[in-house]
């Protein structure tokens, strides 16, 4: 409920009418294509599906949909989208019963950006704890513990698991936000090694691309909600693609400094497809 209220209030703040703000909220909170509910309702494939698990980058409403890209790249497999906007790792852990009920053969996990944002400022962390009813304030330690539990449960259920490193926040790779991203990515690598999962170097490939374009000292992530809401308003109200939104904002790979444009989403899809094919993407 808080996410809906925030998006709606923010859309109003940048000039959208109440009706337009409500429309943006409805679109961004809409169900993902081929989600868990749809799969469990009976559209079950004969083969074990591939399940993509995480938050809004996985859901593909505020971001270009990399899960749909995977469907196009690997058409002989069924893909289930288990992305829920705003989730932290603990919330993903609470959803695992339905995830495991899908009996996935492989699970691609991309979660942690919301955990990072909640650790960047004490007030943000406390706000996340209260609004989400979390048992504790998000932290790197708790994130790593929850992620390890997620992987253990999925592995115990028979799934092969791939853990994506988290994309940059903004484009200034030397700022405090991306130093924190790298700390979380180190935790992801530790969990992958300890739990027998595959590490997918999403951050590393995105950072390399930014550097190759001389864009790795670009606009920094500020923690403001405004770029995200502007992105959603331009996309859902004005019909601009996330690539167009990114270009208008002077950004590369992301329309708002958090979510992914087509190039960014394609990198995630490529890495996941490599994992599914048996190729080893580690070492990028």
Describe each model-derived feature in a short phrase:
Residues 2-25:
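Hydrophobic alpha-helical topogenic segments used for membrane insertion/localization
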Residues 1-3, 26-32, 152:
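Short, intrinsically disordered low-complexity segments
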Residues 19-108:
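Serine-esterase "nucleophile elbow" of acetyl-processing enzymes
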Residues 44-46, 69-75, 91-284:
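Alpha-helical cap/lid subdomain in secreted, periplasmic
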Residues 1-9, 39-40, 282-284:
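Short, low-complexity, intrinsically disordered N-terminal peptides in bacterial proteins
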């Amino acid at each position: 409920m808080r996410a809906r209220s925030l998006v709606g209030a923010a859309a109003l703040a940048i000039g959208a009418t109440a009706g337009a703000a409500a429309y943006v909220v409805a679109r961004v909170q809409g169900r993902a294509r081929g989600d868990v509910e749809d799969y469990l309702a009976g559209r079950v494939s004969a083969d074990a599906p591939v399940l993509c698990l995480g938050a809004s980058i996985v859901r593909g409403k505020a971001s270009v949909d990399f899960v749909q890209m995977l469907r196009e790249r690997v058409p002989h497999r069924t893909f289930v989208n288990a992305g829920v906007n705003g989730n932290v790792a603990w919330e993903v852990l609470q959803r695992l019963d339905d995830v495991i009920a899908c009996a996935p053969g492989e699970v691609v996990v991309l979660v942690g950006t919301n955990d990072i944002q909640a650790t960047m400022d004490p007030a943000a962390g406390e706000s996340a704890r209260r609004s989400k009813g979390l048992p504790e304030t998000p932290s790197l330690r708790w994130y790593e513990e929850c992620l390890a539990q997620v992987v253990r449960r999925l592995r115990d259920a028979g799934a092969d698991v791939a853990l994506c490193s988290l994309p940059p926040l903004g484009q200034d790779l030397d700022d405090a936000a991306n130093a924190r991203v790298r700390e979380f990515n180190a935790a992801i690598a530790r969990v992958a090694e300890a739990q027998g999962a595959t590490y997918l170097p999403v951050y590393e490939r995105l950072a390399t691309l930014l550097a190759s374009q001389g864009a790795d000292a670009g606009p920094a992530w500020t923690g403001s909600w405004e770029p995200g809401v502007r992105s959603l308003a331009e996309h859902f109200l004005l019909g601009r693609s996330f690539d167009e939104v990114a270009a208008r904002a002077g950004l590369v790979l992301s329309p708002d400094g958090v979510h992914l444009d087509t190039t960014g989403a394609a990198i995630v899809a490529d890495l996941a497809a490599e994992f599914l094919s048996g190729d080893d993407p580690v070492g990028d």
